[in-house]
């Protein structure tokens, strides 16, 4: 497969939102691979993070705990926090798939007879592709991300009557 488009950037701590990318699938492309990678999934130094953000963490925890969290609970919260990013694809306005498995690499593979977990079967159709990167939480400053869209001719039977 050849690279059709690449996008990259940096996310700030606390960012929540969506990034949307649209492009036309060139004629002759019958398989797509959409790969999102990012760094800093977990807090790099939980103890330092807790000290810097102690008061906001306590404010967030009190409604759930019904009291001020202990230092141990704050430490557990810091170790459990992670950056959460999902990857979604639509082709011609039709949902093609959504990947939200753990890890810093999310891939949607759309190929006739093969599909990624969380994706629908792909019939090799062309049209506008809309890639949506859903960002639910970023735990560290300057979190780099990269989105690469690859495509190839794949194998598409043109005469199924033979």
Where on the chain are the PLM-derived regions?
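Acidic, Ser/Thr/Pro
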Residues: 1-162
């Amino acid at each position: 497969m050849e690279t059709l488009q690449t996008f990259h950037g940096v996310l700030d701590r606390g960012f929540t939102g969506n990034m949307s990318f649209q492009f036309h699938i060139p004629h002759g492309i019958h398989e797509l691979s959409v790969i999102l990678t990012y760094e800093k999934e977990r807090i790099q130094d939980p103890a330092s993070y807790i000290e810097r953000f102690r008061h906001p963490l306590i404010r967030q925890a009190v409604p759930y705990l019904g009291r001020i969290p202990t230092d141990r609970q704050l430490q557990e919260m810091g170790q459990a926090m992670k950056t959460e990013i999902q990857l979604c694809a639509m082709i011609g306005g039709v949902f093609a798939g959504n990947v939200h498995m753990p890890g810093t690499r999310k891939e949607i593979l759309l190929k006739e007879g093969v599909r990624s977990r969380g994706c629908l079967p792909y019939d090799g159709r062309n049209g506008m592709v809309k890639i949506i990167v859903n960002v639910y939480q970023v735990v560290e400053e300057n979190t780099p991300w990269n989105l690469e869209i690859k495509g190839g001719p794949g194998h598409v039977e043109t005469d199924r009557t033979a």
